Design a protein with these regions (language model features):
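Extracellular glycan-recognition surfaces and repeat-rich motifs
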Residues: 1
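STAS-typified acidic loop motif
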Residues: 4-33
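Conserved catalytic submotifs in the C-terminal HATPase_c
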Residues: 11-12, 51, 107
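Amphipathic alpha-helical interaction surfaces in cytosolic regulatory modules
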Residues: 23-100
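Acidic phosphotransfer microenvironment of two-component signaling modules
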Residues: 85, 107-108
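Short acidic-hydrophobic, aromatic-tinged amphipathic segments that line or gate anion-handling sites
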Residues: 101-105
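A short, charged, amphipathic alpha-helix used as a generic interaction element across diverse proteins
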Residues: 109, 113-115
Length: 115
C-alpha cells in the first residue's frame, strides 16, 4: 500500500494535488498533510487529481471531505479529476458527486475554479 503525492502550482490561481496509488487508512495521513499544508499557506482553490488512484476507502473520502470543508470556510473549493469508473462509482454511491466538482480532465477542473 503506497501513495504518491505531488503538489504543484497551477496558472489558474490554484494548486494541483496529484495522487497515485491507494488512499486508505495507512496512506490517508500523507494526503491530509499535503492538503492541510496548502490550506495553512492560504491556498483555498484546489484541484485533486485522482487519475492515478487505484483505490480509496472511507478514510480517504473523509480526508477529501475535510479538505473541502476547510477551504469552503475561506470561500474556496476543491474540484476532483477522476477517470477511474470504480472510483467515480464510489463518489456516486456515497452522494459525494453532489458536493464535489468531479471532472474528466485537469483543465476542466481548473477552469471551473476560475468561474
Amino acid at each position: 500500500m503506497d501513495i504518491k503525492v505531488h503538489v504543484r502550482e497551477s496558472d489558474e490561481d490554484a494548486y494541483v494535488v496529484e495522487l497515485g496509488g491507494e488512499i486508505d487508512v495507512y496512506t490517508s495521513p500523507k494526503v491530509k498533510d499535503a492538503i492541510t499544508e496548502l490550506i495553512d499557506q492560504g491556498h483555498y482553490n484546489l484541484v485533486i487529481n485522482l487519475e492515478k488512484v487505484r483505490y480509496i476507502d472511507s478514510t480517504g473520502l473523509g480526508v477529501l471531505i475535510g479538505g473541502l470543508k476547510r477551504v469552503r470556510e475561506h470561500g474556496g473549493t476543491v474540484n476532483l479529476v477522476c477517470t477511474n469508473p470504480q472510483i467515480k462509482k464510489i463518489f456516486d454511491i456515497t452522494g459525494l458527486v453532489k458536493i464535489f466538482g468531479i471532472f474528466d480532465d485537469e483543465q476542466g477542473a481548473k477552469k471551473a475554479l476560475a468561474s
